[in-house]
């Protein structure tokens, strides 16, 4: 099983080819292909390649699937014995990306064809 740990949207993610992930909103169009080059670790067969801080020559190719909004988070602030109450909600803007491949040292790591989703409906049913 090939995987990589990347840094995207100021967060670290464990990504595998053929899977989709929700990142903080990226400025990209739908079906646009992006290359993420902040790869901290790559694991294929054998020992993992660990970067200091990034693995040289390693990239992750992703495709933008959609721009959803996250679940609502309710913030409720109250002062006891006073009539001070404040209720706020927040929904984070997200970008759903599909990891197409991981490239390290000229070697391209992709998912098996059986593991990839067949359609957009399969992606929505899985997540």
From Swiss-Prot:
Task: Indicate yes or no for the key word rRNA-binding.
Answer: yes
Q: Which Pfam families match?
A: Ribosomal_L21p
Q: Which domain of life is it from?
A: Bacteria
List, in alphabetical order, the Gene Ontology terms for molecular function in this entry: rRNA binding; structural constituent of ribosome
Give the UniProt record's GO annotations in the biological process aspect.
translation
Q: Does the keyword Ribonucleoprotein apply?
A: yes
Cellular component GO terms, alphabetically?
cytoplasm; ribonucleoprotein complex; ribosome
Q: Which UniProt keywords apply?
A: Ribonucleoprotein, Ribosomal protein, RNA-binding, rRNA-binding
Do you know which InterPro entries this protein is assigned to?
bL21-like (IPR028909), bL21-like_sf (IPR036164), Ribosomal_bL21 (IPR001787), Ribosomal_bL21_CS (IPR018258)
The record, for PANTHER family, names: 50S RIBOSOMAL PROTEIN L21 (PTHR21349), LARGE RIBOSOMAL SUBUNIT PROTEIN BL21M (PTHR21349:SF0)
Stated role = This protein binds to 23S rRNA in the presence of protein L20.
NCBIfam families per record: L21
Assembly behavior: Part of the 50S ribosomal subunit. Contacts protein L20.
Recorded family membership: Belongs to the bacterial ribosomal protein bL21 family.
Q: Which HAMAP family match?
A: Ribosomal_bL21 (MF_01363)
Record protein name field: Large ribosomal subunit protein bL21
Origin organism is: Synechococcus sp. (strain ATCC 27144 / PCC 6301 / SAUG 1402/1) (Anacystis nidulans)
């Amino acid at each position: 099983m090939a995987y990589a740990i990347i840094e995207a949207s100021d967060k670290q993610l464990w990504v595998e080819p053929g899977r989709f992930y929700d990142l903080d909103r990226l400025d990209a169009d739908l079906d646009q292909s992006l290359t993420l080059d902040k790869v901290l670790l790559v694991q294929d067969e054998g020992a993992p390649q660990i970067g200091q801080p990034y693995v040289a020559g390693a990239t992750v190719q992703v495709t933008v699937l959609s721009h959803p909004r996250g679940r609502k988070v309710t913030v409720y602030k109250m002062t006891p014995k006073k009539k001070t109450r404040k209720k706020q909600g927040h929904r984070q803007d997200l970008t759903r990306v599909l990891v197409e491949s991981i490239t390290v040292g000229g070697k391209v790591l992709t998912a098996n064809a059986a593991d990839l989703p067949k359609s957009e409906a399969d992606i929505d049913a899985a997540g």
